[in-house]
């Protein structure tokens, strides 16, 4: 099974970080968000990834082109123009990086990578800018059991601000960042292959 990861958005709400790199490459604990997402999927047996690149996609390409360099100890012999890699650490991943355009919306990005998943019985589809505690194995099993075109995993986000409870013109109470307005946001999707 493959996982398609959207990694092409601009990241306007955290522009202080994303003027240098795409949002999925912002680091958490010294590793890009994208790496954490891929580790989660890999822990559930998904090792084949199609990354939808866009804004500053070359940063993602350079990261994977130099993956051994990032993940291993190395010795550079400058006089002999040689590099020796020590303790090679690599994930069992196959990573396909596709330029899906800078302004392309979600559906357009998925359409541009359709050829890379067309022979799959099903595939996972997720955003490259958020890490969630999701049982991917269970979600895939659920998708297969129900035989639907798509399965969506969603969460209710917390509120962004504390809230006052008012009684007339007096404050009656305060709630620290209550649950959101009841709306859900999509975290990940499993879908049947595009035809």
What does each model-identified segment do?
Residues 57, 110, 171, 186-187:
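A general structural signal for well-ordered alpha-helical segments in protein cores
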Residues 186-195:
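Conserved nucleotide-sugar donor-binding
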Residues 62-168:
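Conserved beta-loop-beta/alpha segment of the NTase-like Rossmann-fold superfamily
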